[in-house]
């Protein structure tokens, strides 16, 4: 069995303060054979109680440069792959298609972080409707995303 983690966030993601080096060193120390760094890239992510609007965007050229350098540095200790976790929204299909054609990602997670512009992580998403209605809307949006976007390898956060 190959020990691999393919869903890792570093300082490139607004929700992590871990350096890429510290993540790779931890993987080596745990005896892992491979990792794929998949920082959040969520175009049009709105302001939330925890993050400012646009927080989950970063410089992809810098990202590839840094991770490519570390792939070489760690090549005898750990297989390092370059991935990304994109935030699916139906209107972003063409944007993500162009992005994944431009950058040679090893792995792309397509995650459903927003339902009609709202983050279901926060209780406000559920206000004014039953849980059943909220989940129905969430799954309807998931289906819409899957019909309009195919620029990813694995679906993330289907049910948060």
Language-model features, listed with the residues they occupy:
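Domain-core and long-helix interface of multi-subunit machines
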Residues: 12-14, 86, 102-105, 109-160
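An N-terminally biased module of ancient metal coordination in phosphate/nucleic-acid-related enzymes
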Residues: 1-90, 99-102
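Short, charged beta->alpha transition segments
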Residues: 67-70, 95-98, 140-148
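Short, conserved acidic/polar surface loops in the N-terminal third of protein domains
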Residues: 91-95, 119-122
């Amino acid at each position: 069995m190959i020990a691999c983690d393919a869903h890792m966030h570093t300082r490139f993601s607004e929700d992590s303060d871990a350096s890429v080096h510290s993540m790779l060193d931890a993987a080596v120390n745990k005896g892992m054979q491979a990792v794929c760094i998949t920082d959040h890239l969520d175009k049009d992510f709105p302001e939330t109680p925890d993050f400012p609007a646009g927080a989950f965007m970063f410089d992809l050229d810098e990202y590839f440069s840094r991770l490519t350098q570390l792939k070489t540095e760690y090549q005898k200790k750990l297989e390092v792959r370059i991935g990304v976790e994109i935030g699916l929204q139906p209107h972003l299909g063409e944007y993500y298609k162009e992005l994944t054609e431009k950058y040679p990602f090893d792995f792309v997670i397509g995650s459903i972080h927003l339902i009609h512009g709202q983050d279901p992580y926060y209780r406000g998403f559920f206000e004014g409707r039953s849980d059943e209605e909220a989940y129905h809307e969430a799954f309807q949006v998931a289906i819409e995303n899957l019909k309009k976007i195919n620029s990813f390898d694995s679906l993330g956060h289907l049910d948060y």
